[in-house]
């Protein structure tokens, strides 16, 4: 029995903030960088007014093929390939609902870069309903909720500038080598320990 690994996409595999930062700077006539986003909500981190936040979110929703054009984080392709040698991988990701092509583009992006097919992708904001042995996400709040529902699972915070201030007592890394080692030693869900 192999372990089942649930991977978030944005912030773990794809550089969502790097993709939307040019939109933010264009709309607001600013020069923010990804490092300026020090919490999960970019609107809160950048201290955007409600009108500014709405304008940016509308732009994200209206930008064709945004999800298809996001950059892959360095090391992610090789990291996923290595983990697939020892575990099942499913991508559990939220959709940007106002962007009509988001899910289609995300599926094509995952297939193109990682050879992950549509049967291995779950679109949901309710990630806690997904069962796995290891769950990797950049949103600390999502990890905590998943762990509440799967107390024998292993939740891994993927380190980013926007979660570095979060309180988290569990696994935390942005190293594919370290994640590989974590997955190697996880006992798959449902297997019994023989004494």
Regions found by a protein language model. Name each.
Residues 1-54:
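Active-site neighborhood of HAD-like aspartate-dependent phosphohydrolases
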Residues 30-34, 42-81:
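Metal-dependent phosphoesterase signature
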Residues 92-147:
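Substrate-recognition "cap/lid" segment bordering the active-site pocket of phosphatases
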Residues 120-124, 170-181:
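Short acidic-hydrophobic, aromatic-tinged amphipathic segments that line or gate anion-handling sites
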Residues 136-177:
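Acidic, Mg2+-coordinating phosphoryl-transfer loop and its flanking beta/alpha structural elements
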Residues 177-192:
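Short amphipathic alpha-helix with an adjacent loop that forms part of the alpha/beta core around
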